[in-house]
Amino acid sequence: MEDSVVDDVIKRLLGAKNGKTTKQVQLTEAEIKHLCSTAKQIFLTQPNLLELEAPIKICGDTHGQFSDLLRLFEYGGYPPAANYLFLGDYVDRGKQSVETICLLLAYKIKYKENFFLLRGNHECASINRIYGFYDECKKRYSVRVWKIFTDCFNCLPVAALIDEKILCMHGGLSPELKHLDEIRNIPRPADIPDHGLLCDLLWSDPDKDIEGWGENDRGVSYTFGADKVEEFLQTHDLDLICRAHQVVEDGYEFFANRQLVTIFSAPNYCGEFDNAGAMMSVDDSLTCSFQILKASEKKGNFGFGKNAGRRGTPPRKGGGKG
């Protein structure tokens, strides 16, 4: 894809900011197709377990909250001023999933060695068919466009290792994960199965009330106790697991004696919660600090799909559903 086309897409998307809101930006179907096919090729040339270096900024779920994505870049610096890793869940629930994913794909194409995207459980046809992205694509474009995005999502990497010490994924650990090579060897393109390693990396959750592995309230994958985090870090000589996938009140929350952190980057999630959003900055010495997007007072009318206009579970210590 020609650089000038990507530059133009980025310029138009960044130009959507209109005070505290963002205007809709209607890219052409041809532009979306170019973004998806170009990004897909880049994803497949890079490993499924990315090996990255600090300094880097890590963001959790954004869920179509495009104005908040722009706020993250205002806080952290627009690429390439900083390196970024996003932990998935770019689409669904919010009302500007198309703009959100298109800006992220455009940045990935333009700065492929400095800007990284992992797959979340919502980058999956069976999930985003229900929770809003399909409806947004169909209303604004066509079902064909949704399928183009699906093909791209099936090629996203699923985990990242920062300086061989911080392991990042969307969901969490898996009882099937014994060696990091098992992540490297997950084939792509792939749909997300309903069980197994790929499923767990995108769906599992920590649970402070259990030891070992437990049933997950989501009806998919497992929960895991602090003992499993400690055991995994010791076995693989790691310092920290960094994941997203759950709404947490302050935008970030530690678990297992600060050996795992949850990051969630969509403040006022779904227009219903009072949660803050956060971004984690990892410096050269692997010291982690947090930048917070405060929750706004006003709760807007949100989005497309199954949960539009419906209250969810309030964020709790330990996290609501992401």
Swiss-Prot record:
Cofactor, how bound (note): Binds 2 manganese ions per subunit.
Gene Ontology MF, one: protein serine/threonine phosphatase activity
Gene Ontology CC terms: cytoplasm; nucleolus; nucleus; protein phosphatase type 1 complex
Pfam family, one: Metallophos
Top EC class for this record: hydrolase
Bias-annotated ranges (Low complexity): 304-316
Keyword Hydrolase assigned: yes
Modified residues (N-acetylmethionine): 1
InterPro entries attached to this UniProt entry: Calcineurin-like_PHP_ApaH (IPR004843), Metallo-depent_PP-like (IPR029052), PP1_catalytic_subunit (IPR050341), Ser/Thr-sp_prot-phosphatase (IPR006186), STPPase_N (IPR031675)
GO biological process: protein dephosphorylation
EC number: 3.1.3.16
Reactions that this protein is recorded to catalyse: O-phospho-L-seryl-[protein] + H2O = L-seryl-[protein] + phosphate; O-phospho-L-threonyl-[protein] + H2O = L-threonyl-[protein] + phosphate
Broad class of the protein's primary localization: nucleus
Localization terms from the record: Nucleus; Cytoplasm
Alphabetically ordered keywords of this record: Acetylation, Cytoplasm, Hydrolase, Manganese, Metal-binding, Nucleus, Protein phosphatase
Cofactors named for this entry: Mn(2+)
Residues the record lists as binding Mn(2+) 1: 61, 63, 89
Catalytic residues identified in the record: 122
Chain residue ranges for the region called Disordered: 302-322
Binding site for Mn(2+) 2: 89, 121, 170, 245
Function recorded in the entry: Serine/threonine-protein phosphatase that possesses phosphatase activity toward para-nitrophenyl phosphate (pNPP) in vitro.
Family: Belongs to the PPP phosphatase family. PP-1 subfamily.
Protein name stated in the entry: Serine/threonine-protein phosphatase PP1 isozyme 3
Naturally occurring in which organism (per UniProt): Arabidopsis thaliana
